[in-house]
Structure formats: C-alpha cells, structure tokens
Amino acid sequence: MAKTKDKSIFVSSVDSDSDIEEIIMPPKPPVEVIQLDDSDDECQDICKPIYNKKVHKDPIVRVSYRQRIPESYFPGISTSLINVQREHNNRSKYDTWGSNSCSEPRISISNIERLEKPSYHEARRVPVFERLERSREISNGRNNQNPIRFNHKFVPPINRQTPLFNNQQLLVNVPFNEHHPTFLEPRPFYRSNVNEYNAGGLNRGSFRKMGRLNMEIVRDNDDFEEHFLAPNFPAKSASIDRRVDDSLSSNSYLRSGMIMASSERLEDPRFSGRLPVFARQINNQEINNDNFYQNSICYNHNNYPSNLESRVSFPFEARHHDADGLNRGRYQVMEHVNMGIMRNSEDFEDYDITQTDQDNHFYNDKDSGKHHRHRHRSKNNKKHKKHYDRNESGNSSECREEDDYEISNPSEKRHERKKRQRSSHRKESACVDEDNYILDEDRFYQQESDEYHNSLEMEREYEHGMDVGVKKEHSYKCDDIARNARKRARLTDDDMARREELFKEWSYSKEIVDGVTQLFGGPPRESERHQKKQKELVFEADRTAMHALSIRSGALVKARLLEIHYATGCHLIFLEEVKRGGYTYVELKGDPEHIKNAQKMIDDMVIDEHYIHDGRESIVYFYNAPHELRNTRGFDLNCRSIEKYCGIIIEKMREVFGIGGYVSTAPLKLTGSVNSIHMARETMQSKTKRFLDEEKFKETVEHCTPISFYRKIIGRCGENLKTIEKVTRTAIVFKRSFDNNEACFSIRGRTDNIKQAIEKIEEITHENQPADDDPGIFQVRVPENMVARLIGRHGVEINRIRSESKAKCYLNAIRGNLDDKFMVCSGGVEEAAYAAYLTKVKIGIIDPKVIQFNSDDFNNLSKVKPMEDPRLVMLKKRYAERKECK
C-alpha cells in the first residue's frame, strides 16, 4: 500500500517486490476529496490487505478516491459520495481472468455515507478467500432471515447467517453526465455488438441506447471481479415482473447466470404502475445455462460469476451463433419495463409469454413446486398467427404454427426456412394487440411525445382566444389528449409539479437536457400574466445579450448557460421557445453587476463541438454588431473577404440608410467549423474595434451642390462616389429629399479627409458646368411627357442624334422645375445647332419643313446667323471634308 503526498489517492500494487509500477491519476475532482487511510473510523472494521501471489499473478495498480457532491444532483436517491475507480494492467479484454487483460475506467455511485466493503476490499486488493473469512468474523452473531446460498465447489463454506455484503452499489456506465440517476426511465439499454467474444466465449458488446435517452442502473462486468460470488438472495421487489417473481425464491438452486435484483430503495415511484408486457416467446429449455446470456456474466479465475445486472430483456432475433450453436441474439424490450432482473432461460422454462396480460395466466403449483402455463390464443385472429424462427440448432426450440401441408423435398424445406428467416429480419416492428401498439421503440415513444406536445399546443391556442362554444369543445378535447398522453408517459401529479424544478437544474451535458425534455414534454410554460411582467426585462436581455443565443431551436446551448450561472451568480430562466422562429428568450435575475458579467459571457460564448446539433459537421453562430454602429454610416465588414479567408458562409441583413451607405446592425449568421468561426469572429471584432476607435476622431459636415450635378457625383452604379470615399477615407450619404433645387449630402471623417472629399466633388461640378455665353452650346427645353420619346428604347433616339450631329448631348434638370428637363447640346456651332434642331423635331416643337431661328425663349438659336436648312449646311460640310481627304 502506498499513498501519494500531493493528493488523497490510494495506490495499491499486487507485486510486493516492486513498488508502484504505474499510477493512473484520476481527473481533478470539482469539489472536495475525502482522504482514506488506515486510521479512518469507517475502515476499522474492514480487514487489512493480504496478498496471495498464487491467486494474483499479474501486478495490478488501482487508484481510487472519493468525492463529495451536492444531493441536488441526485433528487430521489440518497447519494452523497462518488467512488471513482480505475484499474490498468497489461491484460487483453478478450482474455479470461488468469491471462493479461485490462478494463476501462468506471464510475460507481454509493448510496450510503461510507464506502462499501466490497469496493474497499477491491481497492485494497484483498483476495477472495481472506475477504470471506474476514467478513465472517466481523458479522458473526448477526441474525439474518435471508440465508445466503453459494457454490461449495469453488468457495470455502461460510456462515449462512452472514451476509456477503450489506448494501448494494449503483454502477453507472461512463460517461457519467450521460447517465444521470435523476432521469430514470424504465426502458433499458441493450448490447449492440454481439459478434465479438473473448477466449471464454463471453459477449462483451457495447451498450446502445434505444431511440432516446433511457436511464438504467447497470452493474458492469469487471467491477465485482473476485469478490462477488453470485449469492442466491431471495430478491423480492415490487419492480420485478410478477411472472418471474416466483422463480426468485430461496429454494431455487444456484445457477451461474443468477443475477441480483435492484434494491427496494432504488425503486422509482413514477414507474410502479402497469407491469411490462412481452411480445416475444421465450421457451429455451435446452440452452446451456453457463453459455446462454453471456453478456450478463463475467468469469474471474476459477469461473466465479462476478457480474450484477438490473435489467429485464430477452433475445428477440437469432442472428448470431457461436461455435456450439448457441443463440446469442440482440436483446430488446418492447414496452415499458420496470426495473427488474435479467434471468437465464431456465427461469422461464415451461413459460410461454404471449401478447397481453389477459392472454397469460401464470400460477405456481405449491405441491409440485413446478411452474405451469396456461395459454390462450385465438385461432381466428390472424395477428396472432406469427412465425418465430429461433435458430437452426436443436438447442433452442421453434415456436411457430405449422401450415396445413408438409414439404417433403429437402431443398424446398431449406428454401422455405431461408425465406422465413429473411421475413423475420425485415419485420422489426409489428402490432402487439388489438389496440395496435407499435413494437418499434423509437416510433412507439415518439408517438407518445407527439401526442403530449400536440396537447400542449392545443392548450396554448385555447388560451389565446376562441368562441365560447368552440372553447368548451376544444378544452374537453385538450384535457382528454393531455390525460391520455400523461398516462402513457406514466407522469403523476408530483412529476408535473416537479417539472419546473428539474428544468432549472440543467446538467452539463446536452443529452441530459434532451432526455428531460423528452421525459416531461418540453420546458415549463409560463402564464400570460407572468410573461407581461417580465416583458421589459426579457426585451432588454434580448437586445443586449441574446443575439448570440438566437440559434435555431434544438441547437441552443442550454448546458453552457449553467457555467455562466456558476461563474457570475446570475440566475437564468428559460421563458418561452418559439417553434416557428426558433428563438429562445432567457430571463436574467440577479444584481446589476452579475447581469452585466453574464451578458458579457453570453456575447463571448461560441458553440463547442460537443453541442453540434443533429450530428452535423458545421455549426451555426450569430454575431451581433456593437450598438455604437447604429449611429454610424458607411461601415461594412467586407463579408466576402472574411468568407474566403476563414472558409465559412455568412448570411447578412442590411439596413439601408441612403443611396451610398448602409450599416449591418442585424446579427450575422455564420456557418462553418468551430475553428473557422473562431477565426471569423476575431476578424470581425478587430474590424469593428478599429472602426469604432477611428469614429472617436471623426466629424460630420453637410455640403450642398446644384441638383443638376448629383447624378454626376454618384456616377454609374455609384462608381464616382465609391472612388471618392476610398481615396479620401470618408463616408458620403445623400439625403433623399432635395429642397431649394439643391442636393445635400453629409460627409463623415477626419477634418483633412473631409476637405479633400469636397475638393473632389467641386472638380466634378466644375467640369460639367455649362457656359450660357458660349455660342457652341444650345439648350432645348423638353417637357416631362417627351423625355421618354427623346431618349427612346435603350437610348436609341438620343444616340442617333449624337451620331448624326457629332455633338455632345445630355439631359439635365431645370432649376425650379423637377419635372421638365434641358437637352444640352455642346460642341461646334454647326454641330450643336444641328443637334438642337433634331431634338426639336423629335419632340414635335417645330416642323422639319419650316426653319425658325427666332422662335421662342426655349432655345438660343437667335445667336446663330440666319442660314439655310441646317441639313444642307451639314451636307456641304461633309462634302468638303471628303474632298480634302482625297
């Protein structure tokens, strides 16, 4: 025995020649570690470690410690200590006890205040023989009504009045947070991998959950090695099926598959209602009891059965057979099964378990001591005419109804047998009785939960308001559906009252949260009056901190909120879950400082890989921009570059404030891996921080230009405006309403940058300023109803005028009149005059046959000398140019 100085950990080694060969340090306990030593009062009654090299050939190092946890984690079970044991050596898991093997770490929960004797013996590596002798000396003189029966071939005789141990131990499979005793459900686990066996023919398949989270207290294989010798207790409990209760009397002889039932203190009152109904027949009379149900039996050296189970199941398909032709099928329970026992097939001999409780009448013949069966089966009911093919060997019997004819040909027999086997494999779900209970576990329990959720939705709709007559019918229907759903879910009034309390004590594991939701039918629903009182508080929490939690329903990280509660002391309560929108509102209660700290932690919270919803590789995170950006203009995160750099998908919503600028204040939806989301989040935060730091030194200046130039400033698709903003590092936003024939806009940035932007804008206006005194520029007023005619489809007409006249023509607004426009023709005098003439002809002001030089104030053609037809002038000019070229 050796003890470490740093931590209160027992390290024991079997090899006395060498000291500690290997130490496996357990995980750091979250609360308190209780030191165990030889001077402890609790351990005075227990024998000291005595080693026997003949029995223990391989050195084994075990590390054990005890950790105290609050009782609120285990409501309904008086548990205050956890004993974590780990063992490690060089043995293979498929070898027997005599060879080298190893076992995985397991967690055991003790339901008493002190460590139990078997666990203490095993931690100290006390041999079996010395342990039994010592336990006989300690418990000598005690009176026990239930004598212990043991196998005389392998164990030396001890006093039958002495119990082997006083208290049972709850062993929960790792990981611990997935198997919480609070949320016990009567549906057990079953082993899925049944095709792997060790050297002794033992089935060590892994456990698998049936559909959803099902809690079960399971004794694992290697935790009771060398000290639990399968005593034949007369285990009597209300949770045991009454059809096998008589077979558990003290008169039954010891079998290697004898399994202890769970203790009465572990019974759950929620599941003490209707007893289970099996839908398969068990009539295996010729199966060897040492090899059947090997998944529930483990042998240490000298073939001592050392496993303890608390399950009820049975083989329902014979898919796998070992070398001896034994049935090693999967194990499954078809309906709610209370915590009972798993028995060997010999316990069910002479029994024929059929569809319903009414069809089975079991009784015990006290005179003969044998069990009989009485079976009722309706010949006319076609549902009961099912074929059950167990296997091809003679060890297990075939329970099926033969057809009227016999098949004489052996090949036809083989064909029919294979055909029945294929059909039996395909039929994984069937009807049990006339009420059409579905045997498929997932579909069966999903149907119950759907009915319960539908009843809750109907109650909500009823509360929102209907007609008086409709309300009554609706309420009656809701009450019936809810009552039936609660009966099927086996929920009592106490369970419904405890539903709120259970949902406030969230576990660290998301699977536990989902298990509670499935067990009790969703989170607690608050009344409308309570929601009105908390409306302001919830709105503030949603505005400031809950955008990070605005994740689709089902992917909300509820378990991480418990960490925030422990870190800040702020109490978080889930108020409502909206299915359509998928948003969940959380109420924060506590001191103002605690609420601020909780909000910061919620903002910084990123979804972990452990909380990926529906098994997807990508996760969703909502990034909320700071509130200071609401008063800014022209800020953009450049999401496209972030997507390429980080390898994620960003969906954003923009709030448009004007023509040129926008601000992304809505949350951004990021989809990708955890590392890429971390990288994108850091990039966005750095950009926003840099932008906000620069905003402190910026100012806003308003500037106005004539309304005829604002389109030139913006440019085609905003090209001119973007170049000005990029060069000057400013943000320019035009106002939508123009007053006094002026286009006003605001420029935000540093003082030097604002001056530079104004200079760029003045350059554009100066280049496009028309000179009225220039004889080479003509302006023609175009009415509003003629603008489309002058431009033409896709600008065909105005382009024709430009090509014929070789002048620059463009439309411009008229000061004081936003409807009519000017057609400005510039260039040479002849070209501009000809373009103005074509414009007037197009809009119908003049007749092409009549030349008017001094027509009206709509043009300034009076400055041009009287001439002939402008078309003749242009023809003469072109003829002269061609002549010169020749």
Swiss-Prot record:
Composition bias, kind Basic and acidic residues: at what positions? 359-368
Can you list the GO cellular component terms from the UniProt entry?
cytoplasm; nucleus
Q: Which InterPro entries does the UniProt record give?
A: KH_dom, KH_dom_type_1, KH_dom_type_1_sf
Which stretches does the entry tag as region Disordered?
359-433
Query: Where does the sequence pass through the membrane?
Result: none
Which Pfam families does UniProt cross-reference here? KH_1 (PF00013)
KH domain: residues covered? 698-761, 775-839
Would you kindly state one Gene Ontology biological process term found in this protein's UniProt entry?
Answer: regulation of alternative mRNA splicing, via spliceosome
Q: Which UniProt keywords apply?
A: Repeat, RNA-binding
Q: Name one GO molecular function term.
A: mRNA binding
- Compositional bias (Basic residues): 369-388, 415-425
Q: What is this protein called?
A: KH domain-containing protein hrpk-2
Per the UniProt entry, what species is this protein from, by scientific name? Caenorhabditis elegans
What gene name is listed for this protein?
A: hrpk-2
